Amino acid sequence: MAKVNKYNWCIGEDLPIIEDHSKVKLDIIENYLEIYLRYLTKGFKVSSLKLDIIDGFCGGGIYSDGTTGSPIRIKETIEKTKKIINFEKETSNCKTVTFDIKYTFIEKNKNSFLFLNKTLNDYGYLNEDTNCLNGKFVSYLDLIIDNIKNRSRANRCIFILDQYGYADAPIPVIKKIFEQLPKAEVILTFSVDSLIDYLSSEKPQVLYNMGL
């Protein structure tokens, strides 16, 4: 049985309720980004950094209790960490870092996509470093990979794939990311209990969709 997505946003309607485990996932993503950005800029010789951050299943950006979603958390974390890094560089008499960070936020639901644009704009984060795309993550993957390759030889990038379904980012897609972008980082999450139920289906198409 197909699972109904309860995380839909629509301008003028009630916001979705975020569950506790989703809040924990957001905290993990935030902590990971801070640690990773510090890792990439450690050492006194580092003076610039190009990085692409792709949120493949981003939702509308805010929940009913005021909790912000991954697009806002990502932006806030990066901006905060950039300031801390350069403050520490300055106090250590090291050269500050020039950051060139691009964000790609993908949401397949049209209403949620429109809500996301509104949320980003309300927070002042809908600017030239941000690209919002309406559609399926896999449909944009080739374009995203090409853009990353054209931007930098280092190809530094993070894919945040907090998928609601279980075949939205199948194994061959993850493999393709690592093959095309060897320095990519991928944060992949899904519900294990629900995944077991999903795999219990007798339809061979289920395993095929996941690349198994």
Predicted feature locations:
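Short loop/turn segments at strand-loop or loop-helix junctions that form parts
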Residues: 53-61, 108, 188-193
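Class I S-adenosyl-L-methionine
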Residues: 3-4, 20, 148-160, 164-212
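Surface-exposed acidic, glycine-flexible loop patches that form ligand/cofactor-binding
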Residues: 38-47, 92-97, 149-152
